[in-house]
Amino acid sequence: MKRQKRDKLGRAHSNGYQAGLGGKTKEQCPYQNIDAKSQWLGGWRDAISDRNLGLFK
């Protein structure tokens, strides 16, 4: 049985989180679709928050 791919919105959130940890700005969001962009920005915000709390360096 094949594994299912993760949904696109979940992947957008994860990519945004990784971008935030990597120090990218929110203007570097690669998504044009409003839902995917919203998820990416949510992940980016979570990562910035985690970095500010000292969870990541």
Curated annotation (Swiss-Prot):
Pfam families xrefs: RMF (PF04957)
Record's keyword terms, sorted: Cytoplasm, Translation regulation
GO BP terms, alphabetized: regulation of translation
Compartmental location: Cytoplasm
Residues covered by region (Disordered): 1-24
UniProt GO cellular component terms: cytoplasm
Family of the protein in this entry: Belongs to the ribosome modulation factor family.
Function (record text): During stationary phase, converts 70S ribosomes to an inactive dimeric form (100S ribosomes).
Protein name: Ribosome modulation factor 2
Species, as recorded: Colwellia psychrerythraea (strain 34H / ATCC BAA-681) (Vibrio psychroerythus)
Gene that encodes the chain: rmf2
